[in-house]
Amino acid sequence: MKLKEKLDVDHLLFLSNGTIALQIAIRALELKGEIITTPFSYVATTSSIVWENCTPIMVDICQDTLNIDPAKIEQAITPRTTAILATHVFGNPCDVEAIDAVAKKHGLKVIYDAAHAFGTTHKGRSLLAYGDIATCSFHATKLFHTIEGGAVVTSDPEILKSMAMKRNFGHTSLTDFGGVGVNGKNSEVHAAMGLTNLKYVEEILEKRKELCDYYKENLTDLPVEFQKIAADTQYNHSYFPVIFESEKVLLAVMEVLNLHNIYPRRYFYPSLSELPYVEGQSSPISEDVSRRIICLPLYHTLSREEIDMICRLIKRSVRY
């Protein structure tokens, strides 16, 4: 209840993790056939589609926002298409208005993988309020976490009822079953961790913004690119991605940082269009960006002195 109030959403179910959230969302909407999705996301976005016996259809991303390109969605729609599953990459809102318009025109469902989107608002609304269902991850790597966990969010009470049944073995009461379900519940221990962390969310969001701004100040004189954040957005600064000129430069930067026990992540590499179970779906922009992007260390206790050191090492690698 406290989480729902904090996010200002209609209905929320606490689940065991973000991947189960995606799988339950697909099941609750009774999706079949093809699901249009992004090649630039964590592997769970695509693997959940395949796990639920649907076919992922990759639509390439926008070079600047790193989100699925809504202008390319319509041309990927076929008679077998049932939904769009888009990711708010690094918590940056997709073009939700354009995606909604395409979905309504063609009678498609919309799921947003909002694993990174906790705390982001778009046009004054929680980013989790968009789509038929939004899914969250509360893994320990996220800015708000329950050690391990996830959630599904919807404004439709019937969809909520279906997802509640599916996360609890199919139970509709102690002795009645409404269908097939799994054990997607979470525990009181994880919920307690979430309640503890929830008190500090605003402080964490504020600190992460400060740290991201400081990173950017230190790196703007380098030949690097930063993700473009959508307009009318209060961004959560869940990650600090940096795009280098080439993979060669990226690897040189990572080598130097690793030598100093600093370990940035290659989010997201490889492009999901290159997965062995996704064939013949070239996504050139995603594939190019995925080879050149890393996320630098970011957590609310990170100091400016540590950022100074990280940036000095990056500058040394890029320039020499």
Question: Where are each of the predicted segments found?
Answer:
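Conserved active-site segment immediately N-terminal to the catalytic lysine
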Residues: Y112-T146, K161, S173-G178
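Conserved SAM-binding loop
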Residues: F14, T37, M58, V152, ...
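Structural detector of well-ordered beta-strand residues that form the stable sheet scaffold
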Residues: L13, I36, I57, V110-I111, ...
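PLP-dependent aminotransferase-like
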Residues: R27-A114, T121
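PLP-dependent aminotransferase class I/II
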Residues: M1-K2, K6-D10, A71, Q75, ...
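Conserved residues at the C-terminal ends of beta-strands
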Residues: L15, T38, T87, S137, ...
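Phosphate-binding glycine-rich loop
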Residues: M1-E34, S48-W51, M58-D60, R125
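Short beta-strand-to-turn element immediately C-terminal to the catalytic PLP-Schiff-base lysine
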Residues: L128, C136-S137, G150-D156, L195
